[in-house]
Amino acid sequence: MDKKQKISFEGKLHIIAAVVLILSSVMIWMGYGQDIEYHAERIVAIAQEMKIHPGIYRIYTTNSGGYGYASPLFYGDIFMYPYAFLVSVGVDIAIAFRLFLASIMIASYVSMYLCVKSVWGKKTAVLAAYLYAFSPILLADIFIRFAVGEALAFVFLPIVLLGFYRIVIEPKKPSTDWIFLSIGMSGLIFSHIISTVLTVILLILLCIVYIKRIWKNKKTIGYMIAAAGLTVLITAYFTLPMLEQMATTQLFVTDRQTSNLAGNVAPVIGLFFGSEYLSLLNVVIEKITGVADFFVTSWFPGAFGYLIIWILAVRFWKKGIVKNRKADHLLGFSVLYLAISMVPFIQPLLEPFVGFIKIAWRNLTFYILFASLCAAILLVKLKEENKRKAYRTGLLLATFGTLVSFGGLTMITIHNGMYPFETLSSHSIGAGEYLTAAVDNYDYAKERGDVALCEDNDKVTFTFHRDQGYSELEFDNLEGKATFEVPVYMYRGYVVQNEETGTFYTPELSKNGLVEFTVDDVSSGTLQIYYKGTMIQHCSVWISFVTVVVLIILGIWQRKPGKAEKKK
């Protein structure tokens, strides 16, 4: 009688992960997350643009009650397009958003698994992916904060790390693995600029640590330059228009002090419990003592410390239960990023350089990247050496941290209730970071409404109305000249055109941050105001498109049987 084939432990972890990920697509809770309204409205705005015309959208023309908002120029949205398409064909935004968040978790798991597998094998890969994708940090980003950009960064950080590893630590001759570095960085740029800048800082730090290896193998420098150049080409359609806009327009986000790193560190208790548990403890203390708000603190993620405590114990308890040099390097980076996220006196030193990140515990993303990989390597080592007690303790602690994080999520959801997607408004533009600095009032569009002004000619008559994707101003009885201010937020790339004559008028930034233009050649007419884009925007699309097409062709060519045989 044949013995039944047992499923390996790694296989069981795969099954558990698959079940959790599948359930996530249906059961993602929708509480009042910090950024849920903003990102849900972004998807809705893209869907509305899709109904008007196909293409790459630089302005959400329906945002802010039709005033338009340039979020896509500064915050990549390409990964939202598939889910926006679902909304455009009738899928409910709540369902589309759930699918988006679930797909981020799936992609994070798969990305970590494939990247680690290519270097350390299946056993390490499945453990690293498990610890990474179900880490309290990613759970907080997806389920509590709804920080889509930071969550997407989890997908691409392993690819960046793999690219650096293949270039510097274990280079091949000849090698095209530097492309991984470019793909990872490109994905980060499209996902979240703050995470991109922090990753660049990480790469600089890695180069300093491994400077001897880089100096010994001069080709490494060439590979890095090639990766940087390819990244510029792939992301040109996004980065060049963004830089153009920033060079010509003063924005709300660059005109005001927005950072306070020292006030946004993760406290020590965050190693074990999130702020929601302190809120629960406050309720208990108030019931017993009558003292309200015994613990006063801003929100912070929690339960991310169990893993690092186990790693430190495994490495240093009784001179180390297990040893691994590469794991020690990863541990060093884990501790560094944990310190940056939690030690208040470090923040004033960092403020002048990275104050733009606003929240010190954003660095926990990098902490969990290194900690999950370090833990996976040590777990495999422990299993190989048959040290089962330490092995099981590590997995239990990591899983316990995840359960604690889920518990905090449940408390927040019960307290806040479900987010009513039906109340989404076109005025949901986050903190309004990408308004021009001239717009001093976040609610200006809502308060002013669809009102056009002309202050230098009291005889001209005019009416203003909006259509799909553009606005119109009809005027009559114009003698001499008149300067009109229309209710459209001004960004470089807007066009004002006379429907009858085809004449173009130069749009300028008004004192209120709106589109303003002067007419002095006709007495009446109909003017269209729409976003045409700039030459840089149009050319950059072709640069990125051609680059991606060439990469695909080269990839197919490299996989040809004849080419593969020659390599052998």
Predicted regions and their residues:
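Membrane-embedded transmembrane-helix bundle of lipid-linked glycan/lipid transferases
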Residues: 1-417, 529-530, 536-568
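Generic detector of short, locally flexible boundary/turn motifs and exposed helical patches
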Residues: 9, 48, 61-62, 128-129, ...
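Membrane-interface segments at or immediately adjacent to transmembrane helices
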Residues: 415-468
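Active-site-proximal, structured, solvent-exposed surfaces of multi-pass membrane proteins
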Residues: 3-7, 446-568
